[in-house]
């Protein structure tokens, strides 16, 4: 998944950025509209008490499970804005990912010249005005970062705030729970001495069992994958009385951007989780945009099992680059 998604400000948002210091507005709550632009969802009018105004901001945020960017204007901050990135824990994972990956683009829209400090929140308790002010005051004592360091830090922090903590053993990527049927299928696969195939999918923020097949020859594995939806799969191959386990990740170019982002960001967490919880060690990997790449030769080569007919070639373990436009 790329480190940032480029979205554009709407006319309403651009107008706010031009006029916020000269109009009676305390804060603007910004949402991502149609997954292609930043738009002003709500504006909170300014009163004599910034703390009172922030209570209204908090009420607006807690009334929805949708993540949001909040720009707060404090007259005492030399016309600068305070940025609050709010990603509630119960938000949809796809929305969390979208906001996390677009935060750097949001900062560029506002421009660093207009931003004073930034703050991340994911729970109602973290939206307490006094706690936010305390956190922001600590940031003032830290050395300033270069712009590339700032964007990297912001992205990492926003990704961290979007993590679902259902399985603490997941250590990399976006953590998702694995349902019991998927865990049982993987456990059975580990002890199998046959050519068995387990295919997983992500449904409603949970990694679930899509298909479980027994005695599937390597030449037939590719036929079980979708041409439009991503999938994770584990395939066992008998070897000297035990089995080799191959990890297969197919992410078709036809899949939606959201699905590709979700699968890409949860892959490492899945592998970490099954290793920690089930003791499954992966003996080889095939990752591709096209299930047609999962040939018998590639499977045997990836698993380190020699084939009498295998040619000297390199296993496909990555995704193809988009083809350049044809020259006219």
Curated annotation (Swiss-Prot):
GO CC annotation, single: cell division site
Q: Where in the cell is it found?
A: Cytoplasm, Cytoskeleton
Keywords on this record? Answer: Actin-binding, Cytoplasm, Cytoskeleton, Phosphoprotein, Repeat
Residue ranges of domain ADF-H in the record? 1-137, 173-304
> Which molecular-function annotations from GO does this UniProt entry contain?
actin filament binding; actin monomer binding; protein sequestering activity
Composition skew (Polar residues), residue ranges: 306-318
Q: Name one GO biological process term.
A: mating projection actin fusion focus assembly
SUPFAM superfamilies with a match to the protein in the record: Actin depolymerizing proteins
Q: Where is this region: Disordered?
A: 302-328
Identify residues that carry Phosphoserine.
143
Keyword Transferase among record annotations? no
The family classification in the record reads: Belongs to the actin-binding proteins ADF family. Twinfilin subfamily.
Q: What does this protein do?
A: Actin-binding protein involved in motile and morphological processes. Inhibits actin polymerization, likely by sequestering G-actin. Prevents actin filament assembly by forming a 1:1 complex with actin monomers, and inhibits the nucleotide exchange reaction of actin monomers.
Cross-referenced PANTHER family: TWINFILIN (PTHR13759:SF1)
Q: State the oligomer form and interacting partners.
A: Interacts with G-actin; ADP-actin form.
Its name, as the record gives it, is Twinfilin
Gene name per UniProt = twf1
């Amino acid at each position: 998944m790329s480190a940032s998604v480029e979205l554009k400000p709407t006319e309403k948002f651009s107008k706010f950025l031009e006029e916020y210091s000269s109009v009676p507005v305390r804060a603007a709550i910004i949402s991502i509209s149609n997954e292609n632009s930043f738009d002003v969802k709500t504006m909170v009018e300014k009163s004599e008490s910034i703390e009172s105004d922030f209570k209204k901001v908090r009420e607006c945020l807690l009334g929805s499970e949708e993540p949001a960017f909040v720009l707060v204007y404090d007259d005492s901050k030399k016309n600068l804005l305070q940025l609050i990135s709010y990603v509630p824990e119960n938000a949809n994972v796809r929305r969390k990912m979208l906001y996390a990956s677009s935060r750097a683009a949001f900062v560029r829209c506002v421009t660093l010249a207009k931003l004073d400090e930034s703050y991340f929140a994911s729970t109602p308790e973290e939206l307490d005005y006094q706690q936010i002010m305390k956190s922001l005051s600590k940031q003032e004592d830290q050395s300033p970062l270069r712009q590339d360091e700032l964007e990297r830090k912001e992205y990492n922090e926003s990704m961290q705030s979007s993590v679902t903590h259902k399985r603490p053993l997941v250590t990399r990527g976006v953590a998702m729970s694995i349902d019991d049927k998927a865990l049982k299928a993987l456990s059975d696969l580990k002890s199998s001495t046959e050519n068995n195939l387990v295919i997983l999918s992500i449904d409603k923020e949970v990694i679930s069992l899509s298909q479980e097949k027994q005695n599937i020859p390597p030449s037939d594995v590719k036929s079980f994958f979708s041409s439009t939806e991503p999938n994770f799969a584990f395939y066992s191959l008998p070897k000297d009385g035990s089995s080799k386990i191959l990890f297969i990740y197919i992410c078709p170019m036809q899949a939606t951007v959201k699905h590709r982002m979700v699968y890409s960001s949860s892959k490492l967490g899945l592998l970490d989780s099954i290793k920690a919880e089930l003791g499954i060690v992966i003996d080889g990997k095939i990752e591709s945009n096209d299930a047609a790449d999962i040939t018998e030769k590639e499977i045997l080569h990836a698993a380190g099992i020699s084939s009498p007919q295998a040619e000297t070639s390199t296993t496909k373990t990555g995704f193809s680059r988009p083809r350049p436009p044809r020259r006219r």
